[in-house]
From Swiss-Prot:
The lineage of its organism: Archaea, Methanobacteriati, Methanobacteriota, Stenosarchaea group, Halobacteria. HAMAP family: MfnA_decarbox (MF_01610). GO terms for biological process: carboxylic acid metabolic process; coenzyme A biosynthetic process. Keywords: Decarboxylase, Lyase, Pyridoxal phosphate. This is Probable L-aspartate decarboxylase. The modification N6-(pyridoxal phosphate)lysine is found at K206. Pfam families: Pyridoxal_deC (PF00282). Its EC number is 4.1.1.11. Its cofactor is pyridoxal 5'-phosphate. Catalyzes the decarboxylation of L-aspartate to produce beta-alanine.
Length: 350
C-alpha cells in the first residue's frame, strides 16, 4: 500500500489552513527528523533552534522578550493557554469566556481541563463586546479573542477584550493560529504590542510555511509558563512545561528555516498576493449573484448551495462549509490565480 500511495497534492485544495512547506523548511525537517526537543539536555542543537523559533515568533507578534515553545499545533497551544489560566486562578469553579466563533479546540480544552466554556455571540463576524461583558465574573480565568477566525478570517477587537479580562483579573489569550503571519502587514490591533495580552497561539505550519507539526504558544511573562511545569527526574533537564513529552525536532527546525527565509519581506509579499487573490475571488462570486462575506484576511465565504458545493467536490475541489452553511475558500500560499480561475470555470459549468 505505501509503495503505491502518493501524498496529497495541493492543486485543488481550497479548504485547508496548512500549505506546502517552504523548500528550506522541508530540507530542515528532513535533517532533524530524529531529534526530540522534549529532551533538551540530550538534543542541545534542536533546543537552541526552538529558542530561535520563539524569538522569531516574538518579533512577529510584538513581544521583545518572548517565552514559549513550538507545539504540535493550535489545539495544543490553546489548551495550554487555558491550562495556565486555570492553574494560576484562585477559584474552584473556573470559566473561560470566548467568542462563539472560537476554534473547536476550546471546547476540547474545557472538557479536558474541567472548566466551563461560555460563548459570546458575534456581530458582523466579530465578538459582541457587550454580550461578552455580561458573561465574565469573578470565576472567569481567561477571556479569549480570535485574530483571524477559522470560518471567516475576521479579527476580534483584541484591545477591548484585553481590557475586559483585566476587569476580572483574568488572563487574555489570543488565537492567531492562522492569522498571525498575515496580520503584521495590516492595520489591525492584534498583538502583544497593541494590548495587554498574556498568551497567544500562532502556528508556523499554517501561513508560516513550516512543515507539520509546528504550532506555537507564546507568553508575555515567563512566570506564566511555570504554571505548566512538571518535574522530569529521569531526563537531563529537571522539569518540562510542554503538553507532550516527545516532540518533533523536524517541526522546530522547519519553523526556524521558514521564518529565516521569509520574515518579513517574503511573508509581506505572500500576504499581498493572497489578499489580492481573495479579493478577486470575492468579486467573481459576487458578480455571479452570490452573497459574499467581504474578506478581511485571505479567506472568502459565499452562499453556494450544497448541491453546487458537492459538484465542486466531485470535480476534485477540496472545499468546506462554515457553520452557517457558506462555502469557504482559504487563499493560502499554494492557491494561485490560475487555480481560482479554474475553480470559477467549474462553478460556471454548474
Amino acid at each position: 500500500m505505501l509503495q503505491r500511495a502518493e501524498p496529497q497534492d495541493f492543486e485543488r485544495v481550497l479548504s485547508s489552513m496548512c500549505t506546502v512547506p517552504h523548500p528550506s523548511a522541508r530540507e530542515a525537517a528532513e535533517r532533524f527528523l530524529a531529534t526530540n526537543p522534549g529532551d533538551p539536555g540530550t538534543y542541545e542543537t534542536i533546543a537552541g533552534l526552538e529558542r530561535e523559533a520563539v524569538e522569531y515568533l516574538g518579533d512577529i507578534t510584538g513581544l521583545s522578550d518572548p517565552a514559549g515553545y513550538v507545539a504540535s499545533g493550535g489545539t495544543e497551544a490553546n489548551l495550554q493557554a487555558i491550562r495556565i489560566a486555570r492553574n494560576r486562578a484562585d477559584t474552584d469553579d473556573p470559566n473561560v469566556v470566548a467568542p462563539v466563533h472560537a476554534h473547536f479546540s476550546f471546547t476540547k480544552a474545557a472538557d479536558v481541563l474541567g472548566v466551563e466554556l461560555r460563548t459570546a455571540p458575534a456581530a458582523d463576524y466579530r465578538v459582541n463586546m457587550a454580550a461578552m461583558a455580561e458573561l465574565v465574573d469573578e470565576d472567569t480565568v481567561c477571556v479569549v479573542g480570535v485574530a483571524g477566525s477559522t470560518e471567516y478570517g475576521y479579527v476580534d477587537p483584541i484591545p477591548a477584550i484585553a481590557d475586559l479580562a483585566e476587569t476580572v483579573d483574568a488572563l487574555c489569550h489570543v488565537d492567531a493560529a492562522w492569522g498571525g503571519f498575515y496580520l503584521p502587514f495590516t492595520d489591525h490591533d492584534w498583538h502583544f504590542g497593541h494590548a495587554d495580552i498574556d498568551t497567544m497561539t500562532i502556528d508556523p505550519h499554517k501561513v508560516g510555511q513550516a512543515a507539520v507539526p509546528a504550532g506555537g504558544l507564546l507568553a508575555r511573562d515567563r512566570t506564566l509558563l511555570d504554571e505548566l511545569a512538571v518535574e522530569t527526574p529521569y531526563l537531563e533537564s529537571t522539569d518540562q512545561l510542554t503538553l507532550t513529552g516527545t516532540r518533533s525536532g523536524a517541526g522546530v527546525a522547519s519553523a526556524v528555516a521558514a521564518m529565516e527565509s521569509l520574515w518579513p519581506a517574503g511573508y509581506r509579499q505572500q500576504y499581498e498576493t493572497s489578499m489580492a487573490n481573495a479579493d478577486w475571488l470575492a468579486d467573481q462570486l459576487s458578480a455571479r449573484g452570490h452573497d459574499v462575506v467581504g474578506p478581511e484576511l485571505p479567506l472568502v465565504a459565499a452562499d453556494l448551495s450544497m448541491p453546487m458545493t458537492d459538484e465542486l467536490r466531485d470535480r476534485g475541489w477540496r472545499v468546506s462549509k462554515t457553520g452557517a452553511g457558506e462555502m469557504r475558500v482559504v487563499c493560502m500560499p499554494h492557491v494561485t490565480r490560475s487555480m481560482l480561475r479554474s475553480f470559477v470555470a467549474d462553478l460556471d459549468w454548474y
